[in-house]
């Protein structure tokens, strides 16, 4: 049956494929930073959040996502190491080449989820590299789970 409603929040505009944005179940909220998003704009409790952000750390974003989550829900977050590590760890072209730095970036995000009371349910290297070739990760959290 699929999703009954999807809220798509983006600081940009017109980023979503028109075939998706035309779907009546999709509510597009463009030009909106999640840090300024009001609960009244997403009145439903969210069962699943899929987070793919750039130029900002998930350390900032995930606590904001948490405001909208249902008591028992899930979060899938794409971890982009270049936005999680110190600038000195980011090489030419925005690539994080040091495997230890990438691991630290992933662990940092997992720690954020745990501080929010989320259970880490999985972590894997993304099968798709970032646009510039960065190795990225997918983190899966369960919100409101018994630990």
Model-derived regions, located:
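Short loop/edge segments at beta-strand edges and connector loops
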Residues: 30-32, 122-125
């Amino acid at each position: 049956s699929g999703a009954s409603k999807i809220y798509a929040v983006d600081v940009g505009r017109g980023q979503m494929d028109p075939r998706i944005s035309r779907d009546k179940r999709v509510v597009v909220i463009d030009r909106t930073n999640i840090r300024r998003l009001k609960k009244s704009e997403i009145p439903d409790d969210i069962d699943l959040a899929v987070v793919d952000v750039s130029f900002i750390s998930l350390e900032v974003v995930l606590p904001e996502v948490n405001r909208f989550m249902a008591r028992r829900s899930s979060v899938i977050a794409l971890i982009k190491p270049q936005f999680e590590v110190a600038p000195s760890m980011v090489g030419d072209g925005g690539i994080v080449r040091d495997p230890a730095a990438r691991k630290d970036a992933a662990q940092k995000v997992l720690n954020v989820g745990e501080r929010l009371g989320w259970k880490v349910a999985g972590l894997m290297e993304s099968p798709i590299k970032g646009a510039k070739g960065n190795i990225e990760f997918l983190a899966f959290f369960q919100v409101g789970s018994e630990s």
